[in-house]
Amino acid sequence: MASLGRQVPEWHRLMALSWACLARQTCHFRKEKKMSPSLFCKLTTVPSRGNFQEFSSVRPKKYMQEPEHRTRLVPCLHEEQRTCMGSESLELERAISSLQDMGFAEAHIDSLLNIQPSVHPQQLLDIISELLLLGLNPEPVFMALKKNPQLLKLSATQMKRRSSYLRKLGLGEGKLKRVLSVCPKVFTMRQQDIDNIVKVLKEKCLFTVQHITDILHRCPAVLQEDPSELEYKFQYAYFRMGLTHLDIVRTDFLQYSIAKVKQRHIYLERLGRYQTPDKKGQTQIPNPSLKNILRVSEAEFLARTACSSAEEFEVFKKLLDQEEEESESHMSEEEEEEEEEEEEELP
């Protein structure tokens, strides 16, 4: 009994210490606002009746407080979205103001901003500024971008590089207006393709530098032609029709398709209304001007130049197509025979 009497105060002291420890840990939990693994440990106390009982230090979930950063997450996201939208709106307003200062009409501004919606407004302004520096007015710039939206995907560096290249070809200071209206891909096509055309005009056709500049300015469609077909067109004009280099440049001959040229030239030739000049450039009959052959409509060509009916010209075109098909077939057969002979000669 004496021993039991001494144990009772010890049990009460142990219980008091356990509750004090629990109170300190709970207070610490509230201050830190987070759960510590040590708080999940269960405390064992000895009550006065001598039975062991477990007390959990974890409070019910309904009393747990959500972390502060979670409660602030959604407002932060909304604030970032509002900031982003405000920044985009400000950039758009600045772009519209700049385009107005450049001289673009309101309708053009709306169209420009919708041509490539993914393009940043500042990049749009950079591209347009480069085109204006080449001597273009707002109207041709708008038409060029509308015909070739890929222009807006170029960087300012690429635009400056291509502009410098075109200036070297003599296409600066306002001459690009016609080039862009006819061939808006002049800025986006490969430079190697342009070089190939210039090389044919210079080395195969023997045009001067000034002639090449005039051709690119007056007939920009040649930039999109196949180099071999362009060379053939020149040879037809020079050898079959007897035209000089200056005639070809001044009459914009290279802008017409070879099919149209051959149809009208050969038709006049068979009617006896056109002759190929001799070595001295002379003919027995006066040839009609190229303007009356190529620059006029088909109806005017037949009425004033050929003095023929539309039915006769249609029959002639069908016959000419058959002749060319037979000629091509005959040429391919000759090429095959030559290849077979070469193979037989090989040991």
Curated annotation (Swiss-Prot):
Keyword Repeat tagged: yes
Which residue ranges are recorded for the region named Dimerization with NSUN4? 310-327
List the keywords (alphabetical). Answer: Mitochondrion, Repeat, RNA-binding, rRNA processing, Transit peptide
Q: Name one GO biological process term.
A: ribosome assembly
Write out the GO MF terms: double-stranded DNA binding; rRNA binding
Note whether RNA-binding occurs among the keywords: yes
Once renumbered to this chain, the transit peptide range reads: 1-42
> What residue ranges carry the coiled-coil annotation?
none
UniProt note: domains: The MTERF repeats form a half-donut shaped, right-handed superhelix, where the concave side displays a positively charged path for nucleic acid interaction.
Hey, which family's this protein in? Belongs to the mTERF family.
Query: What is the protein name for this chain?
Result: Transcription termination factor 4, mitochondrial
Species: Rattus norvegicus (Rat)
Question: Source gene?
Answer: Mterf4
